[in-house]
Curated annotation (Swiss-Prot):
Name by which UniProt lists this protein: Basic phospholipase A2 sistruxin B
Self-association state and partner proteins as the record states: Heterodimer of an acidic subunit and a basic chain. The acidic subunit is non-toxic, without enzymatic activity and comprises 3 peptides that are cross-linked by 7 disulfide bridges. The basic subunit is toxic, has phospholipase A2 activity and is composed of a single chain.
Role of this protein: Snake venom phospholipase A2 (PLA2) that shows presynaptic neurotoxicity. PLA2 catalyzes the calcium-dependent hydrolysis of the 2-acyl groups in 3-sn-phosphoglycerides.
Cofactor dependency: Ca(2+)
Record keywords, A-Z: Calcium, Disulfide bond, Hydrolase, Lipid degradation, Lipid metabolism, Metal-binding, Neurotoxin, Presynaptic neurotoxin, Secreted, Signal, Toxin
Recorded superkingdom: Eukaryota
Active-site residues annotated for this sequence: 63, 105
GO MF terms held by the record: calcium ion binding; calcium-dependent phospholipase A2 activity; phospholipid binding; toxin activity
Amino acid sequence: MRALWIVAVLLVGVEGNLLQFNKMIKFETNKNAIPFYAFYGCYCGWGGRGRPKDATDRCCFVHDCCYGKLPNCDTKWDIYSYSLKSGFITCGKGTWCEEQICECDRVAAECLRRSLSTYKYGYMFYLDSRCKGPSEQC
């Protein structure tokens, strides 16, 4: 499922939030979201279940939880204002939803940077079928 979604995003040429989130991830980690995070563990990419596999996957779990607190926002497609300078991501002004989505993405990108030292290439293309057990509460 995640693979189909990512391919669809690439084919459409998204100019919204997902592209912005990728830029934040690249800024913080020097890695492109695709392929390094799009299919990582049980929570990076579309959906998620089971227990996060490591600190990187936990960043994605927390990001999913953050989006989950914004049920009336278009978290995947809303375009928000932000800047990347002096080593920091700064979210700009916008609608309430845009500002909240930007903060979710900023916090996740910074979390991924902090988790770089424990990134495991074995989780890079992790099969959903290996994500077992109940999901944690947000």
